[in-house]
Amino acid sequence: MDISTDNPDHGFQFPGTFELSAMGAAERGLETELPRLLAATGVELLQESVSWKHSSSGKYVSVKIGFRAESREQFDAAHQALRDHPEVKWTL
């Protein structure tokens, strides 16, 4: 199947700045581990864009990470690294 658009300005543009979020158990240290994991994929981590928030019960943490990717392949590798982490319940 060929997917195309009538407006080439829609969709991801590379190189570009992006943000991914991941949620998992709060006691697993994901706040520090996930940014390191993304950096290891070769994307440029934007330290000022790394943030996290604990759930109201304190059981879970949502980690938001900003980064710069030079290509779709880099973006996909970064997203896959988060999805592959055994403590990550979901990504966005």
UniProtKB/Swiss-Prot annotation:
Cleavable signal peptide: none
Gene3D superfamilies: 3.30.70.260
Family to which this protein belongs: Belongs to the UPF0250 family.
Record's protein name: UPF0250 protein XOO4915
Organism, as annotated: Xanthomonas oryzae pv. oryzae (strain KACC10331 / KXO85)
